[in-house]
């Protein structure tokens, strides 16, 4: 951990740890949480970024419960992997302003939670393929 991290942490009232639902990223987040604990920071919150519901459903990506079990800090938001983030970035527009973007809505919800509002977590559904729907018929 670099001195810049320690300097930033010293002045922080709140720490937002952002990770992705991958084992290596969660391990890194756990190390950061350990450093924050050693710095006597108590207000540590988690954001899980780039969630892919289809991969979670197949067991190829950690789900929020798995991540919470490992990190044991309060999760304040989950952000889906959303192609509209790339589109918005390429147009120079903030994705949070795009009301059709799942990620934009997730960012808005995180902001509202940070301001003290009680906002339910979004549920992300996987898109069923034609063959998945066909299988259900038989």
Annotate each PLM feature.
Residues 1-81, 86-87:
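Conserved catalytic-core segment of NTP-binding enzymes
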Residues 7, 19, 89, 99, ...:
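Residue-identity detector for threonine
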Residues 26, 78, 96, 118-125:
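Secondary-structure transition/capping residues
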Residues 27, 38, 50-52, 91, ...:
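Arginine residue identity/basic-tract feature
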Residues 55, 98-102, 122:
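A general boundary/transition motif marking the beginning of the first structured unit of a protein
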Residues 65, 94-96, 114:
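Short alpha-helix boundary/capping motifs
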Residues 74, 84, 105, 109-138:
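P-loop NTP-binding site
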Residues 91-105:
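C-terminal boundary of histidine-terminating zinc-finger modules
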């Amino acid at each position: 951990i670099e001195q810049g991290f320690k300097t930033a942490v010293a002045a922080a009232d709140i720490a937002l740890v952002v990770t992705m639902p991958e084992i290596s990223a969660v391990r890194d987040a756990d190390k950061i949480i350990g450093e924050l604990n050693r710095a006597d920071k108590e207000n540590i919150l988690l954001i899980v970024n780039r969630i892919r519901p289809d991969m979670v459903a197949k067991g190829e990506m950690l789900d929020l419960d798995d991540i919470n079990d490992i990190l044991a800090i309060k999760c304040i938001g989950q952000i889906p992997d959303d192609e509209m983030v790339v589109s918005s970035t390429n147009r120079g527009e903030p994705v949070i302003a795009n009301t059709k973007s799942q990620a934009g809505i997730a960012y808005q919800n995180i902001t509202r939670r940070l301001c003290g509002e009680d906002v339910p977590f979004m549920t992300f559904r996987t898109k069923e393929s034609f063959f998945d729907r066909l299988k259900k018929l038989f």
